[in-house]
Every structure is written in C-alpha cells, then in structure tokens.
C-alpha cells in the first residue's frame, strides 16, 4: 500500500525544485489533472495498486540518484555532467505513457467461503498505441523539449523487455553504448521494479 497524497507531494516538490524547462509548468498541470497520481504502474506485474505509477516513478528517481552519486565518487565517472534536471525528467516522467492507460474492471472470484464475488482488477485501455518508451518521449515532447540523452534514456528504459528488442531490433545496444545515462535509467527502473515494489 502506498500513501498517494504523500507521494504526490514528494513528486511535486522534486519536480518543481529540479525541472525548470520551458513548458514544464504546462506538463505539470496536465499531470495534476490526469490520473497519474492514482494510476497503477502495471496491470499485474509490479505496483498494480492505486498510486503505483507515481510510487514507481519516485522509486526510479531515488535509485538513479543513488547510482549517480556512487558512480560520481569515481574519477572517471560518465555521469559528472548529468544535471539534476535531466535526472528528474528522465525518471519521474519515464512512464508517462501509462497515464490514462489502465482502467478498473470486475471479475468473479471465489472468496474464502467458496462464494463467488466480484473483485476489481486493472485492465489495459490503450488510447494512443504508440509503443512504450517512445510514447513517453512523444507525450513529454508535446509540452517541452528533451535533450537527446533524456530522450534516449526514456525511450529505452525498458531494456530487454522493450517490444522492439523482443522483435529483434538491436538499436538498444547502440543506444546504451552511446548514451550511458540511458543504461543507468534502465538499471534504476529494474532495481525499483524488482527490489522496491509490490509484485503480488
């Protein structure tokens, strides 16, 4: 269970303190008017709970900050020039594609007494079939410009789970090689998903 209001307040604080780019205010207003803060992160795989999407985004942010802080202790760190704005954008907004993506449906399940009852569950209601990471890039770009590094990080954050990779596309290897920050955001996403979140 997550505290939706506490997570929303923390998300807004991080966003407003770090993201100052032109158009970011309009994007934040759109987010606040959307289901972002109450949506699940998935229908069944991780954080499939009320407020799971915002919680996941914060977890990815925290993991990325921790990874970059550790990497930057090294003299030859690849991340010394990554701004706090880029970290916030690439992690807090990486799953923007999930806004208005899930809906609650009902199914019949036997309870502990053997009686059938209707229980809610999340289903996918795809309104903009534009992919996953690339859809998030597209949606963000409707409000503000992304740097190439941010776009790559958001676009490829799914890593090997990305449908393009599953289909045989090898672009991800080139992207991770050319844009180390994209690799780091993917690792932060995996850590958040498998180490920090509800998977029931």
Give names to the regions the model predicted:
Residues 1-112, 116:
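Acidic/His-rich, divalent-metal-binding segments that scaffold phosphate/diphosphate chemistry
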Residues 1, 199-200:
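C-terminal end-of-chain micro-motif
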Residues 47-49, 55, 67, 79-198:
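Divalent metal-dependent catalytic cores for phosphoryl transfer on phosphate-bearing substrates
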């Amino acid at each position: 269970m997550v505290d939706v209001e506490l997570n929303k307040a923390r998300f807004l604080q991080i966003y407003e303190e770090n993201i100052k780019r032109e158009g970011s205010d309009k994007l934040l207003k759109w987010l606040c008017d959307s289901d972002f803060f109450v949506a699940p992160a998935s229908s069944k795989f991780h954080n499939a709970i009320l407020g799971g999407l915002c919680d996941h985004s914060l977890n990815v942010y925290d993991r990325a900050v921790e990874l970059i802080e550790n990497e930057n202790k090294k003299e030859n760190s690849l991340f010394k020039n990554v701004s706090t704005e880029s970290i916030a954008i690439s992690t807090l907004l990486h799953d923007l594609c999930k806004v208005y993506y899930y809906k609650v449906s009902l199914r019949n399940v036997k309870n502990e007494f053997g009686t059938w009852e209707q229980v809610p569950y999340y289903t996918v209601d795809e309104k903009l079939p534009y992919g996953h990471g690339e859809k998030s890039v597209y949606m963000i770009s409707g409000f503000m410009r992304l740097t190439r590094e941010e776009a790559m990080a958001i676009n490829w954050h799914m890593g090997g789970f990305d449908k393009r990779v599953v289909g045989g596309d090898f672009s991800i290897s080139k992207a991770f090689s050319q844009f180390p920050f994209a690799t780091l955001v993917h690792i932060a996403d995996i850590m958040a998903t498998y180490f920090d979140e509800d998977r029931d």
